[in-house]
Amino acid sequence: MSLSSPQRPTEQLDLFRALPGDMAPRDSQDLMAYPFFSLAKSRRTKPIDFRSGNVAIRVEGTQEHGIATIWDADILIWAASQIVEARDAGITTSRLMRARPYEILRFIGRGVSLRDYQRLKAALDRLQSTTVATSIRETTGRRLHRFSWINEWKELADARGTPLGIELILPDWFYAGVLDAALVLTIDPAYFDLTGGIERWLYRLVRKHGGHQPGGWQFDFKHLHRKSGSTAKPHDFACDLRALVARQSMPGYRLGIVRMPGTGAEVLTFRPVPPTAQG
């Protein structure tokens, strides 16, 4: 499927062909820190609305596709990884990218069956049809930048109909953030093995805020629920957090729960775990 968009024509962009081989996965810090994606595998059509200080975010999806999910965002992690790898190697990059589906699927830890390919196309459809309005990186905090996660994408084939891969165009907002080295972090490849939406979202938040600080970081449950954009009730969300602490499945980090003196409010703590101590 090829989805159109009122963006500037494809021919005005240079083509960036995906690089072969393994590379470290990189993620955009803005996407790690704020609620841009649905955390549910079921279709979500309720908009995500988030405001904190000068930061405003509104994410909307269509009735047909719903809002792009945190699993769909793996494609953006692949794109960011490609762009950073090429930039560091002195290779010219572009918002217009071409790749073979199996290259993307392999990188994000998926299978390469027909069903996996169909799921990849469905993810691309959700990324293209999801609209975002945000004040992040807008200097006044009052102006909103509006875009879709993918401006457009299409399947390629030769004259005989033999598949040649896919092309996609990334939005300026995402592309500019990835090119800024200060706005990108390397993530653990084990992230792609995480199966839960809240689990995946929490890893990205922990990686963004905890980094490699020896003392770690902490957030109260109420703040985490608000920052996740989750539609889960606070009680259910808290249960999910407690289950994650009990499971200790977060790559590179150890989670804990403490209660605030006086209020008794639960606080999630996290700190880096030395590689030798990771199971």
Task: Describe each model-derived feature in a short phrase.
Residues 1-279:
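Charged, alpha-helix-forming regions
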